[in-house]
């Protein structure tokens, strides 16, 4: 994204190469040996479409973009397209080059023709070398309503006309609207004084050049003169003996050279070379005796201050501009998280916004665009400003990207989601897939279940999986966000069987096999599979436990995993039953393990129990473990290394499904 802004607003065509075209359109260039004018016009283009909101008092600046229906609004919407497109003479020039290539080949001796590689072999070969002369910048007026189409890019038909009569006039108009500054990801900062990297002191000295005033400071000029006189007096004394001898030297063409030394000091150079940044390491008033050079404070903090100084400089230069100042000042900050610890990353956006706000007046507003791979950077941000770039694949396997506008997230509870994601550091936005679990036990043990089975779950082990503990009653609240982001998602939840006791007025927890039992889990009732009766849930096949997310360009799947009936033996008898919760399934599917470790867990099994009695004992124990469910999970975690247990079947099934989904996406 930053590359596109730099390309279209700095207009350095040399920055663009053939590889900036999406690989999905390369076939339209490769193998093309003949090209007509009509075919050239259909060649791929690189576009940047912009939608601007303009206050009424600034409408005169965007008259070229406005239509009559905007005149009744206080804020007008205008749109324009910046395009890198084939020149009108591309086909002609390419065919001339091809003709010359064929002619050159024919002129080769017959023995060498087979080895001779004429240029260009095809259109791809031609553009590899001539892209910057074969393509040009174009500018169009767009219909702003075209931006309202959800999930759709602006089509060629959305352009309502050329922006100006000439490219030069169009560029001048665009420059009068938008000025873009870049804070690059590679900031060349270093703690090593001998390195070629920058430090804050060098940056501060550069800042002096930007902030230089045309007014003469007479007091500073007088001080500089006095300094020159003192320095000259010192230098004359030091060189007096040497120059006295040199002045007596005579030779061919040399007569009494009369050398002298004088002090010449440049105010700018003197200030620049004497500007060094120090940090005070002790609290209290400024004390030169308690300061250290900047290299002792760490690259993270230096990077942080560097970006703030850059933003401040950029705003000052834009606000101090003469003539027609661009209406919009956009500062694009690329991956600010470099070298910064998580806490500083979390504070960065808030501090940067406050820093910009201090510089602003009623008419000078700098806007920030921040690209990041860090969940900490968006820690203190609402949904509205977030644009989520989801990597996906076209049907032919071409890598692509879909941009989702989180301000359009359709949910009745955005405040809950925002607060929850803030607590979990927003890792969901940077994940390859998401697993939603009910409680502490699953959150503690699930990573262990994945890591100890890399052969069966290679994609899960190597991918970035966001594990969110959402609680049984809250998983459903994540449905809009999971669908919106389009990530493969696995919801691991519980059957939570309940039944009405005799003479009761309220359903209570019961064994899964209780007649007439239903689930109290709203995820199963309102999301997937959309059923309430326990017996129906247990009979649901795998296909009924997944749902296709149909939002966005590339749909993804969501699957639910809950307890299923499994066969176990106890007291010489075989039984077929399902646990009500994760903990019940863990114990019922690891009975042999419990024989050896029951005492450590705090639940020793009686060999004389019938299978039905055993299920009831497990149910009663899990309802109220002696030291709580979290402690039970930690005990299971601690014992695993010396005595591994088996992952419950329903979780194995769900993890295998998610691994296959990630494997399928990797193949695409």
Q: What annotation goes with each model-predicted range?
A:
Residues 32-36, 62-68, 153-173, 260-263, ...:
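Short alpha-helical segments and helix-capping/turn motifs at coil-helix boundaries
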Residues 18-43, 56-219, 409, 508-550:
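Glycine-rich phosphate-binding loops of NTPases
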Residues 418-436, 440-668:
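Acidic, Mg2+-coordinating catalytic modules of nucleic-acid enzymes
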Residues 1-9, 278-424, 638-668:
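Switch/communication elements of ASCE P-loop NTPase nucleotide-binding domains
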Residues 54-57, 85-90, 187-190, 337, ...:
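Conserved nucleotide-binding/hydrolysis micro-motifs of P-loop NTPases
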Residues 185-333, 360:
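Extended helical coiled-coil dimerization/tether regions that scaffold
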Residues 181, 331-333, 435:
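Hydrophobic positions in the central parallel beta-sheet of the AAA+
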Residues 1-23:
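N-terminal cofactor/phosphate-binding cores enriched in small/glycine residues
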């Amino acid at each position: 994204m930053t590359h596109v802004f730099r390309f279209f607003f700095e207009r350095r065509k040399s920055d663009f190469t053939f590889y900036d075209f999406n690989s999905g359109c390369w076939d339209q260039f490769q193998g093309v040996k003949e090209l007509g004018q009509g075919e050239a016009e259909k060649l791929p283009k690189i576009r940047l479409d912009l939608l601007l909101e303009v206050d009424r008092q600034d409408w005169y600046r965007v008259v070229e973009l406005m239509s009559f229906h905007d005149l009744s609004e206080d804020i007008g919407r205008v749109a324009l397209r910046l395009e890198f497109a084939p020149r009108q003479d591309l086909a002609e020039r390419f065919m001339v080059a091809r003709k010359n290539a064929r002619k050159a080949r024919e002129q080769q001796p017959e023995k060498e023709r087979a080895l001779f590689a004429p240029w260009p072999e095809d259109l791809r070969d031609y553009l590899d070398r001539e892209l910057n002369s074969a393509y040009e910048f174009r500018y169009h007026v767009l219909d702003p309503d075209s931006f309202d189409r959800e999930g759709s890019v602006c089509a060629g038909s959305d352009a309502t006309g050329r922006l100006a009569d000439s490219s030069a006039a169009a560029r001048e108009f665009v420059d009068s609207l938008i000025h873009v500054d870049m804070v690059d990801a590679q900031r060349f900062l270093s703690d090593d004084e001998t390195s070629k990297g920058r430090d804050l002191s060098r940056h501060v000295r550069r800042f002096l050049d930007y902030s230089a005033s045309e007014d003469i400071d007479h007091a500073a000029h007088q001080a500089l003169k006095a300094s020159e006189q003192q320095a000259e007096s010192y230098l004359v004394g030091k060189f007096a003996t040497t120059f006295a001898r040199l002045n007596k030297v005579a030779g061919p063409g040399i007569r009494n050279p009369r050398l002298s030394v004088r002090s010449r000091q440049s105010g700018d150079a003197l200030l620049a070379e004497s500007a060094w940044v120090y940090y005070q390491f002790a609290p209290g008033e400024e004390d030169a005796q308690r300061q250290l050079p900047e290299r002792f404070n760490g690259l993270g903090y230096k990077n942080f201050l560097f970006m703030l100084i850059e933003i401040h400089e950029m705003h000052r230069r834009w606000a101090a501009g003469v003539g027609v100042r661009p209406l919009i000042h956009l500062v694009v900050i690329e991956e600010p998280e470099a070298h910064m610890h998580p806490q500083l990353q979390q504070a960065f956006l808030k501090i940067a916004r406050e820093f910009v706000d201090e510089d602003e007046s009623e008419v000078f507003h700098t806007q920030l665009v921040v690209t990041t791979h860090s969940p900490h950077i968006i820690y203190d941000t609402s949904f509205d400003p977030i644009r989520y770039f989801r990597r996906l694949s076209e049907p032919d396997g071409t890598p692509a990207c879909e941009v989702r506008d989180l301000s359009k997230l359709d949910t009745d509870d955005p405040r809950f989601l925002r607060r929850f994601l803030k607590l979990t550091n927003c890792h969901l936005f940077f994940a390859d897939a998401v697993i939603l679990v009910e409680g502490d036990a699953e959150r503690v043990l699930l990573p262990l279940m994945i890591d100890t089975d890399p052969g069966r779950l290679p994609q899960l082990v190597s991918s970035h999986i966001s594990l969110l503990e959402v609680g049984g009653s809250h998983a459903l609240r994540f449905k809009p966000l999971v669908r919106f982001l389009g990530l493969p998602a696995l919801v691991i939840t519980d059957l939570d069987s309940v039944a009405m006791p005799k003479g009761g007025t309220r359903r209570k927890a019961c064994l899964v096999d209780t007649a007439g039992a239903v689930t109290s889990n709203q995820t199963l009732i309102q999301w997937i599979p959309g059923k309430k009766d326990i017996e129906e849930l247990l009979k649901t096949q795998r296909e009924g436990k997944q749902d296709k997310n149909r939002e966005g360009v590339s749909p993804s799947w969501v699957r639910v995993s809950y307890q299923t009936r499994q066969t176990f033996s106890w007291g010489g008898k075989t039984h077929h039953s399902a646990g009500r919760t994760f903990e019940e399934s863990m114990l019922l599917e690891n009975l042999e393990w419990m024989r050896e470790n029951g005492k450590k867990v705090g639940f020793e099994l009686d060999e004389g129990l019938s299978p039905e009695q055993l299920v009831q004992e497990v149910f009663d124990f899990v309802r109220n473990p002696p030291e709580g469910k979290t402690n039970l999970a930690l005990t299971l975690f601690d014992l695993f290394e010396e005595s591994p247990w088996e992952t419950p079947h329903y979780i194995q099934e769900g993890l295998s499904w998610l691994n296959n989904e990630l494997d399928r996406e990797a193949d695409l």
